Amino acid sequence: MELENIVANTVLLKAREGGGGKRKGKSKKWKEILKFPHINQCEDLRRTIDRDYYSLCDKQPIGRLLFRQFCETRPGLECYIQFLDLVAEYEITPDENLGAKGKEIMTKYLSPKSPVFIAQVGQDLVSQTEKKLLQSPCKELFSACAQSVHDYLKGDPFHEYLDSMYFDRFLQWKWLERQPVTKNTFRQYRVLGKGGFGEVCACQVRATGKMYACKRLEKKRIKKRKGESMALNEKQILEKVNSQFVVNLAYAYETKDALCLVLTIMNGGDLKFHIYNMGNPGFEEERALFYAAEILCGLEDLHRENTVYRDLKPENILLDDYGHIRISDLGLAVKIPEGDLIRGRVGTVGYMAPEVLNNQRYGLSPDYWGLGCLIYEMIEGQSPFRGRKEKVKREEVDRRVLETEEVYSPKFSEEAKSICNMLLTKDSKQRLGCQEEGAAEVKRHPFFRNMNFKRLEAGMLDPPFVPDPRAVYCKDVLDIEQFSTVKGVNLDHTDDDFYSKFSTGSVPIPWQNEMIETECFKELNVFGPNGTLSPDLNRSQPPEPPKKGLFHRLFRRQHQNNSKSSPTPKTSCNHRINSNHINSNSTGSS
């Protein structure tokens, strides 16, 4: 039994390392799988695609790179891209260097004497920006200038781009992105854990070698529990939220027995494991602060979509290979209608906010309560209203949440105690983060005084702990309890509408990021010599005929051999046919 676990872990680790070969986990046929269609095959896509500048040239990663390549080939446009790059660099510059970096931008791009002067930024705006730079430079100083540049680029340059070979290439990538996704798109590895409707296992995309976690939702189990709306809700929220602090949905597909969500794989284990199983319970405050900042950024991204998470607890915060965290398991998350409040007594005992326990109407407030619980537990090594391994009834834990104050040990600095106290305020109207500014108010608390959130969001800060790349941070294969067989449930055509809403294939932004991160984009995005069209982009050149399969080649070779060996006289041929006919009948009657 131990051997089975060792084998499963060894195979998984080898896959995570890229298989040890030059292809880094890619299939031998990866270029064939990702072969561009001829541009003539993309005409339907050209007619139906939403021609929005921000979607095509800014939000979508491959679209952004191709628009950049287009601008670099047009005289006078390259400086606009360089300006936007420098503004992005300015926004993650340490505060003490903002003045010098801002002056560099003003001199190089916003001065009429400069050879790369950007005239599209109005002189009044330039004067205002220069004045603010001298008074007190801030991260958002050049935001309005950058917007002016985008306003220019989305005009004539964007329309020229739509008629260029770079946009044609983007259509080819979109065609690949929209190809059907099945279980054969992936290699499957060991089970990592259990979800509400089925197992979670590691998987790898054959074409790119990228590792993911596949969350299987068994169709019969969903139907038996009437969990269709819950499963579809989680899928749609994951699809919409594109955050580096929340697990991303990359693919959604179905098999005969299950619906599958293919998600960011988090190899470093969950916070519960690290709080309680790595030395003394709890973290040093510096480490707790780093995780709290990343969790806060994840909540901010969810709240931007008007989505409340409702299940913050250590088990749902996962670490990746590098030690960064992501919020996982959005099964209880819900989108709040604009200008409305919701009601629902859901969550985990000891982490539910007072307004949830009292079944009151609420907005985003339960998530700030949950953040307070997490910060407290990371520092103290136990949750604020329940001792470690304390056996206590649910009703008693709920009473403590509603009536008692949390106790702070010497482990807490004044700033840590203050932020926990303000986040764990019983009255949600008085709670930190529950005013109009939301997460921005929490970020300004002295606890985060030394945290540069811009650099954190840009992935430029090193985590305080890096998981061991040779470790598998999950239970042994045989210790993960298996689901029992669902009986008495039949699937029929009435379920097909739900399955079609769920099984939508690739999710654009994660899929495009995958192509870039695995260097498939770099290797395949090739044009003709000296900026000319490649054959697959040449409308006047017919597409290559598809390669014949193995069986076709074998059949053709056999047919040629038979033709060479068959006798030429007609009588012989008839005799051979008759003989075969006789043999066939003889065989049939024996």
Swiss-Prot record:
Membrane-related topology note: Peripheral membrane protein
Matches recorded under Gene3D superfamilies: Phosphorylase Kinase, domain 1 (3.30.200.20), Regulator of G-protein Signalling 4, domain 2 (1.10.167.10), Transferase(Phosphotransferase) domain 1 (1.10.510.10)
Region: N-terminal, residue numbers: 1-185
CDD domains from the UniProt entry: STKc_GRK5 (cd05632)
SUPFAM superfamilies: Protein kinase-like (PK-like), Regulator of G-protein signaling, RGS
Segments of this protein annotated with the region Disordered: 558-590
Protein name per Swiss-Prot or TrEMBL: G protein-coupled receptor kinase 5
Organism encoding this protein: Rattus norvegicus
UniProt gene name: Grk5
